[in-house]
């Protein structure tokens, strides 16, 4: 019996929608990274692009546990003096998409395939999204008993 290797014609890219209301950031990021890589499919191969599209709704309503609101998210442009520091509390008000995207990006592999997979991530602040024509499947994240409020 030969080992199955998926060809590009065998790969499909499904659409999933996740509601991020009161979901802890790390739990949301791990589930989204798994879907983006396509690890939920039987045809998964680490070298093949078998990932899915993931739509995350209500990005401004995610839950941050512990004292993350006081911590900062760092980004550097590569130029002298290009260090940018933004606190999570400020980013949650102005740009919650950046918080979620950076958490998911850290959970993807560090290779060329990660950029392709990250391009399939669609983050929306509200409850409505423009991807209804793709007929996304609802993906539920199991909540843990204790929640950060």
From Swiss-Prot:
One of its GO terms (molecular function) is structural constituent of ribosome. Gene3D superfamilies: Ribosomal protein L13. The keyword Ribonucleoprotein applies. GO terms for cellular component: cytosolic large ribosomal subunit. Belongs to the universal ribosomal protein uL13 family. GO terms for biological process: negative regulation of translation; translation. This is Large ribosomal subunit protein uL13. Keywords: Ribonucleoprotein, Ribosomal protein. It comes from Bifidobacterium adolescentis (strain ATCC 15703 / DSM 20083 / NCTC 11814 / E194a). SUPFAM superfamilies: Ribosomal protein L13 (SSF52161). The gene is rplM. This protein is one of the early assembly proteins of the 50S ribosomal subunit, although it is not seen to bind rRNA by itself. It is important during the early stages of 50S assembly. PANTHER family: LARGE RIBOSOMAL SUBUNIT PROTEIN UL13M, RIBOSOMAL PROTEIN L13. It holds the Pfam family Ribosomal_L13. Part of the 50S ribosomal subunit. It comes from the Bacteria. InterPro entries: Ribosomal_uL13, Ribosomal_uL13_bac-type, Ribosomal_uL13_sf. The keyword Cell division does not apply.
